[in-house]
Amino acid sequence: MATPHINAEMGDFADVVLMPGDPLRAKHIAETFLEDVREVNNVRGMLGFTGTYKGRKISVMGHGMGIPSCSIYTKELITDFGVKKIIRVGSCGAVRMDVKLRDVVIGMGACTDSKVNRIRFKDHDFAAIADFDMVRNAVDAAKALGVDARVGNLFSADLFYSPDGEMFDVMEKYGVLGVEMEAAGIYGVAAEFGAKALTICTVSDHIRTHEQTTAAERQTTFNDMIKIALESVLLGDKE
């Protein structure tokens, strides 16, 4: 039945949901890549859709910005609508010079300055990692599509406008590939409620060089990332 944030019924969502931050990007993904699309959520403007990709039922829905927002939606999708796999498809900022604008990054793990997972994990550090099979399927899908995807750690930040520029040096030293705001929270929710999760990001801006894509490009041109996510779902069905 409907929750305070999702006005859908059991069965409206597929067992796999792709989740961008922007609900308009969710609409674009549904209209561009899925067939037989229908809207299944519009509460607070957080649009959700279900359709088929190559005959496979798949849903796509926005999760908003930051760990608090995405944690609400992912928790409800898992516990109230039977969703088994979450694939975040979003943008990130690069901190390493060998990571370029529009590179695709597969988030094997996610560091964070948020305390959300410590609260969940009784004030201990929780290793926020993606599901291994989902990582492997995304890597295989990228190879099949001819996309040179990077695999490694992301950093999920609580602050978009961070005053601590020195932290970027620490991230670079530790090999962090990109900075975003949700992966660690989504991985924590998935672990807590017995689901599986993965984050795939496209580099939308470079923190070192100040290169950036436009808002319109972020909404419509990150197609490689979406194709990798969708094809990885099909590979997962063969396991």
UniProtKB/Swiss-Prot annotation:
HAMAP family the UniProt entry points to: Pur_nucleosid_phosp
Enzyme class: transferase
Function statement: Catalyzes the reversible phosphorolytic breakdown of the N-glycosidic bond in the beta-(deoxy)ribonucleoside molecules, with the formation of the corresponding free purine bases and pentose-1-phosphate.
PROSITE patterns xref list: PNP_UDP_1
Binding site for phosphate: G21, R25, R44, R88, V89, G90, S91
NCBIfam families: deoD, PRK05819.1, PRK13374.1
Keyword terms, alphabetized: Glycosyltransferase, Transferase
UniProt site positions, description: Important for catalytic activity: R218
Binding residues for a purine D-ribonucleoside: H5, E180, M181, E182, S204, D205
Catalytic residues in the record: D205 (proton donor)
GO cellular component, one term: cytosol
E.C. designation(s): 2.4.2.1
GO molecular function annotation: purine-nucleoside phosphorylase activity
Catalytic activity: a purine D-ribonucleoside + phosphate = a purine nucleobase + alpha-D-ribose 1-phosphate; a purine 2'-deoxy-D-ribonucleoside + phosphate = a purine nucleobase + 2-deoxy-alpha-D-ribose 1-phosphate
Stated family: Belongs to the PNP/UDP phosphorylase family.
A Pfam family it matches: PNP_UDP_1
Assembly behavior: Homohexamer; trimer of homodimers.
GO terms, biological process: purine nucleoside catabolic process
Record-given protein name: Purine nucleoside phosphorylase DeoD-type
